[in-house]
Regions:
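Well-ordered alpha-helical segments embedded in enzymatic catalytic cores
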Residues: 54-57, 113-119, 142
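P-loop NTPase switch/communication element
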Residues: 63-118
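Conserved catalytic network of the ASCE P-loop NTPase/AAA+ motor domain
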Residues: 34-36, 46-47, 64-65, 69-75, ...
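Hydrophobic/aromatic beta-strand patches that form the interior of the parallel beta-sheet core
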Residues: 41-43, 81-83, 106-108, 130, ...
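Glycine-rich phosphate-binding P-loop
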Residues: 38-64
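Conserved P-loop NTPase
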Residues: 1-8, 182-207
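Conserved P-loop NTPase nucleotide-binding/switch module
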Residues: 124-183, 188
Length: 207
């Protein structure tokens, strides 16, 4: 149910989207198949540990075409569709992203994730779809639709471990089905955005 009215407000929190270009360099090598396809990726992180910042730079690099650090090869950029439900990825102003999301990126700003993912598939034909903070049953249904349409997916979710995520009814089922080919765990050890682990879709540790 939508919130229609709020009153007796005692404080206000203003969140400012903060981009850090290059923060995804450490993980990009793990996110592509041998033939250059972007692998379905889930970023797991507690609040305030950098998952949205990491996703934002992943989007930019996938769109522009990253240069892998281990091989040094340039992977061609692809079209990316972003559903920015809370305007935290692109920070759009009058329809224009104020953060750099890449030259091949289309953004649906202030649009519900579950509806936006299906709208992008039907109208924009992206090769990769990116969303922040999934979790609802509707989100999972939209993700299944995206996968069945041949799009790759990049998403984030709140959690402190892979076991924690497996306990979430809807998302846990997706992971058991192998929907995500890469899973990245962030923690705040020493600094926000610290990469603690990277797994493949079968739970094998890659990093």
């Amino acid at each position: 149910q939508d919130i229609r009215l709020m009153k007796s407000i005692s404080f206000i929190n203003i969140r400012v989207a903060h981009q850090i270009q290059g923060c995804a360099n450490q993980v990009m090598d793990y996110l592509y198949s041998d033939d250059g396809r972007f692998l379905n990726t889930l970023v797991i992180s507690p609040p305030r540990c950098g998952k949205t910042t990491l996703l934002r730079d992943m989007i930019r690099q996938v769109s522009d075409g990253p240069r892998t650090q281990r091989s040094g090869r340039r992977i061609p950029g692809v079209s990316v569709g972003v559903v920015d439900e809370r305007s935290e990825l692109g920070a759009c102003y009058q329809g224009v992203p104020q953060n750099d999301l890449g030259m091949r990126t289309d953004v649906l700003d202030c649009c519900p994730k579950s509806q936006g993912m299906m709208m992008l598939v039907r109208s924009m034909a992206p090769q990769v779809i990116a969303v922040d903070e999934i979790g609802s049953r509707e989100d999972v249904q939209a993700i299944e639709y995206v996968r069945n349409c041949g799009c790759s997916l990049a998403a984030t979710i709140h959690g402190s471990s892979l076991e924690d995520i497996m306990q979430k009814p809807a998302v846990g089922e997706l992971i058991q089905q192998g929907a995500f080919e890469r899973m990245i765990l962030l923690d705040c050890r020493g600094r926000a955005g610290h990469v603690a682990s990277i797994w493949d879709g079968r739970g094998n540790v890659l990093y």
